[in-house]
Structures are given as structure tokens and as C-alpha cells.
């Protein structure tokens, strides 16, 4: 189960396929990306994590000088390219600087397994520091994630934050890795939590140094006192909608919640682009 979940066949490594998917799904992205490339405005940067994993991100400065900066975090088996629609929202529509990391074992980043947000929270925190340096050491920053990227965002939110971090946006993130894997085990294979979940959890602790219950967005949001905007589709059956109510309840004020009518998993922006943009704005 551990390899099935953390080392799936599709790990967001096919960049050309990712670009093709994004241009087909969001046709307005291609002229924007082409313009960025023509003007050498879409840039790559690499860093090393404390455990010596090479990590990659794309970044794009706003067309006008600004402190407003968004760090945008992708979902499970996706990569930074697959979050370019949110990059467009912030950079093209709202005039933000943006940085979009490839999480471990996706895109151009190293690593040997997906980390479900828990180790990624440390990497994203490092990327937030990098983005602040790139954009002048005096940014006003939002962190925005979708799906596993939203869980990562919430896991980040429970850590101590520098003054430049102002708020978080989580779109359809799960309560914990334990809850999400338990749900998938039951739905895909008809199996109970015991014994497989407990065995896989133990193996994850041995191999990666973290456990399924430890990797809890629910516990982390309870420690966050910065503003957070929760978004979830009411037709989401992959990360079920009930999870957002528990997360929202656990988070201290200030907070806001938007349940998006008729939206399934990770498609709230696709199906409600203008309203999504206005609410994030």
C-alpha cells in the first residue's frame, strides 16, 4: 500500500503532457505562457532541502513593481505546471509576483516518493523564504494550494510564520493522510483500516520518518491564527466535502468558507473562474 500511494506510476514527471493538458483545459493560458517565455519572464530556480534533495520551482514577477506575492502549491501526482491557472489568476489578473514549486518526486524536483504534504510543508516554507528574497525581502505573501497542495498549505500554516506571510487559501485539502488513505482503502479495495493501514503507517515511519496520523492538516490549522480561506466543491467525492467542515471548525478566526455548488474535486476554479477570482481577490 505504501508504494501504491507514495510511488504511483504517474508522478507528474511528463512535463510536455502537463503543458498540453493545461492549454487544452484552460485555453487562455497558452498566449500568456508564450508571452512569458518570449520575454524570458518565466524563470526556473533550484534549491536543496536540508536533507539534500534538489527542488525546483517556476517564478514570474508581476508586470508592475509590487510586494504582493503568491506561493502556489500543486496536488497529488500533479506538478507546478498543473497549477498555472492559479498562477494566471494571481499574476495576470491580480498583479502578484508568483512562485510555483514542484513538490518532491514531481516535475523537475528530486526525491524518491510523494510526501503527502508533511515533509513538503518544510520545503514550501523554504520556498516561501526564497520567494521573499527574490521579490525584495519585503513581500506580502499568500500561500494557495489545491488538493494535496491545500493539505500542504494547511500543514505549513500551523508552523511559526514570518511577518511577510499574511494569509492562506486552501482548496479541497484533506484532514489528514490517515483519513484520506483510509477512505481510499475502503472505497477502492473494500478493506478496513486494520491491519493494512497500521502496517503501512509503521513502514512509512521507518522509511520516511513520518506517520499517517502525524501528517494532520486538522491539527495544524488549529494552531494557525492568520486568515485562511477554505474552498471545497459540494460534489467532491475524492476528498469528501465533509472534511472541510471539520477543518473550518478547527481553525481559529479569522477564516472564511466557500462551498462551491456542483464542483467536483479540484475543479472549483475551472467551473467558477470569475467568482473564484473575485473571492480570492
Regions found by a protein language model. Give the residues of each.
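An N-terminal hydrophobic leader/cap segment in hydrolases
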Residues: 1-47
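The serine-hydrolase catalytic nucleophile loop
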Residues: 76-90
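Short alpha-helix in the alpha/beta-hydrolase fold that links the catalytic acid
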Residues: 86, 217, 226, 240-249
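Conserved alpha/beta-hydrolase
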Residues: 90-110
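Alpha/beta-hydrolase active-site loop
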Residues: 114-135
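Hydrolase active-site cap/lid region
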Residues: 155-210
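Short beta-strand/loop motif that positions the catalytic acidic residue
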Residues: 223-225, 230-232, 236
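Catalytic histidine neighborhood in serine/cysteine hydrolases
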Residues: 248-266
